[in-house]
Amino acid sequence: MCIRDSFSYSYTALNIDNLAFVVALGIDSSDSKEIKVTFQFVTPPSSNEGSSQETQIFEDTVDTNSIPNAINIMNSYLARKIDLSHCRNIVFSEEIAKNGISNFIYTLMNDNQVRPTSNIIVSTCSANEYIKNSIPSLETSITRYYDIFPSSGKYTGYVSDATIGKFYNALVCNACEPYTILGGVTSSTQTGSQSTVPDDSNIKSGASPISGLRSTENIGIGVFKHDKLVGELDAIETVCFHILQNNLSSFLVSIPDYNNSNSKIDLILSPKNTV
């Protein structure tokens, strides 16, 4: 009887219906506390309700002094245990990143639920706004979208495959400097705002001419000196970064037309095929 009861309790404690699955975590500055933490959740279909139930996405935010405190408060608020094992995106606002994020990185990496492969993003808008606007336009699963969007850098060069694990490794390396994905909300979604970037190759997140169902974008790289954000690379600068890293399978560049000073020629460059 004792053995049966212990197994029954273990199953109940770890049952999917007792967990709150976080797919994105955002960290902003707070007016009242140290930080404002945004959790983006998915509610998977209940095993009792069949597979036809749609997955729902929602966000909750808490002002607190640390990430562990935020998790503890949210555990109480939701009456479920926060689970970070499915967290795909970790987002910092520019303001937080400029002040240093090493303490947050160490805290998250010490949590055995956090995947080292989680994307790490610095947002030109607030992390809360970035997460709330991250609605996949083609994918039916938001986790699928979070998994695949960095891979577009292989054929565009405009986004990097930056993860919290790589960021941590660069922090503890004396000869390395960390970097992140540069995210943001398209300028066209802001009332009366338009992109003022004169050249397509100089666009970056928060200053691009893109408009569509999903207002978030990921173009460029956030550059760090140790744990502080010190600069941002635009599209063509990110392409150059990938060329140096040998991370590209193909990319497009525009060069001036020698015969027409008002025109440019688009070239798609790819490695030479070997026989």
List the predicted regions and their residue ranges:
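Membrane-proximal alpha-helical signals and transmembrane carboxylates
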Residues: 4-275
